[in-house]
Amino acid sequence: MNSPEKLELLNQLLKHAKCAPFYQNRLPKNPLSSWDELKSIPLTTKEDLRRESPFGLIAVPRLELYQYHESFGTTGVPVSVWLTRDDYLAHAWEIGQWGVDFRSNDVVMVRFPYSISAAAHMVQSAAQWKQSCVIAAGARSSVSPASRIVTMLQKLEVTVLTCLPLQVLLIAEAAEMLGFKPSRDFPHLRVIGTAGEPLSISRRRMLEEIWGVPILDHYGMTEIGAAIMDCCYGQPHPLEDYFVFELLKDDFQTNAEEGEIGNLVVTPLYRLGTPMIRFVTGDRARYMNQQCRCGKNHILQIRGRKEHTITVGDRIFDIWDLEEIISHLPCRRFWAVGPLEQGLHFVVEQEKEDSGITQQLVEELKSRYSMDLKFEVLPKGTLYDRSDLLNVANVGKPEYIYTAQEMAEKAYAKSTKI
């Protein structure tokens, strides 16, 4: 709810944000007197952030900066985000509202990437704030492939796994390759927390079937922090006391109607190091006002990025729509899609020997979705090479001293590298 008290918080933020070079001449001189005036403030885009990085958005003295992160877009040009200690703690508090509900007796494995990006650090801080024990097992590291994750999940009796939805699937694949059944052989695991890519209802259901535990998502970005949290019932609720959310039509002036998909614009109310005023996230979202079993009554579904949609005629298909089609197939884990003149062309990986797609099923789906559909079933491993899941890199400490025999054998030429 956008209350008068929240407007006062926003005005305090706007006053503070003028300390950043980028916002000095960009914000109104006088406080906003109503929420309608918010649209008079220019939007902040990714292009603005790239142009002003690394220092143009800092709004505090350099001595107050506590942690640095970068966000990489498709251009590869990084966006700089500087946090004060209060910013860092606020992000941990935000993730502490997650329906995952970190507990003092939890063993939490953090599988988000640690290098430069923010999610892993914030999840770790939130878990430790709740007195949980954390295993830092960052993704994109040669020393912690999926096979090692599987071993640690079982050996260390992990109760909470946090990672990208794709990682949830890849870890399951590795477990199956090692002879485990994810829903049976990890009895201590009680919940999996995800973030980093859209999690549709269909994909959530598939992952829950594989693992036999709830999958709870949260939405955030390095630029804004963690803004939308799944409750324990899997419904995404915006943290409205800590953010201003706008959902705009494609003109970026008109508010989207309830239930209509619009463009998500977010202003964090408590970001001091690098304020973000009316930040265009690039994500499409849908707002619904409906009572949830948890007691909250606002739901904000993230539908994915606008560039990650396919248009067929006058119909737009986003990741939620595409995964809903995939959910009817016998092979649903790994897929890709492209447009046909009057429909969609899917390629899917075979999962079992009998997981072919019958012509009868194709015709039923064509009728259900009123368009042409083409499905190709590819051999397992075509889209994702499973061999990488089990590879462990040979790493170690630097070595300087060798025996005479090792010197003669030139062991130094093939010593383990860091």
Spans of model-derived segments:
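A polyampholytic, Gly/Pro-enriched intrinsically disordered region
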Residues: 154-163, 209-214, 235-244, 393-403
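Active-site phosphate/ATP/adenylate-binding loop shared across adenylate-forming ligases
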Residues: 47-188, 198-206, 210, 234
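Nucleotide 5′-phosphate-binding alpha/beta core
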Residues: 1-93, 97-98, 104, 155, ...
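Residue-level signal for inorganic ion chemistry
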Residues: 16-17, 71, 161, 220, ...
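AMP-binding/adenylate-forming catalytic core of the ANL superfamily
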Residues: 161, 265, 270-372, 396
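Conserved AMP-binding/adenylate-forming
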Residues: 199, 203-291
